[in-house]
């Protein structure tokens, strides 16, 4: 089972009816909190009892100056979480918030990343290699789009 965590205090998760739930399902996973409608808060006890195999956290929602994600740090260092399968197996992953927390064309990138995390044997990649450590500013695609549009406009003028 897989859980997408938006925040850790309180534990805010993506449930049924969210595009994160759809990404998890399309990647071959089962949302550990599929019984929760939309986004919701679950107690620490509920989270521990659910015992997910994978924990996905969004980057950028809690980055330290050193580039660490405080949500991921919470799950890895919280003593009460040490019995959770995802923590025991080091399956707590940071995913770029620009691809997992915003519905749009880049959701395909989230699907690819989640599928790689859940099925590294199929995709031939080490899931920990796909985990970003820096916060994405979200402006990386502007320059190529402008260049493409300029090329199209110049082509039309001829």
Residue spans for each PLM region:
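Binding-cleft/active-site segments that stabilize strongly anionic ligands or cofactors
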Residues: 1-108, 112, 122-125
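A generic membrane alpha-helix/interface feature
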Residues: 46, 114, 156-158
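Internal hydrophobic alpha-helix adjacent to the cofactor/substrate pocket in enzyme cavities
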Residues: 116-120
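Secretory targeting signatures
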Residues: 126-158
């Amino acid at each position: 089972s897989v859980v997408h965590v938006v925040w850790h205090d309180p534990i805010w998760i993506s449930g049924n009816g969210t595009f994160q739930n759809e990404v998890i399902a399309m990647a071959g996973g089962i949302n550990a909190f599929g019984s929760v409608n939309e986004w919701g808060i679950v107690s620490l006890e509920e989270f521990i009892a659910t015992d997910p195999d994978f924990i996905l956290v969004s980057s950028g929602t809690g980055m330290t100056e050193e580039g660490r994600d405080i949500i991921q740090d919470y799950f890895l260092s919280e003593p009460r979480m040490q019995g959770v399968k995802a923590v025991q197996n080091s399956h707590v992953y940071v995913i770029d918030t620009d691809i997992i927390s915003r519905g749009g064309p880049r959701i395909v990138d989230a699907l690819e990343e989640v599928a790689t995390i859940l099925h590294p044997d199929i995709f031939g990649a080490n899931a920990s290699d796909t985990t970003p450590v820096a916060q994405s500013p979200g402006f990386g695609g502007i320059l190529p789009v402008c260049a493409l549009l300029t090329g199209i406009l110049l082509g039309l003028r001829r």
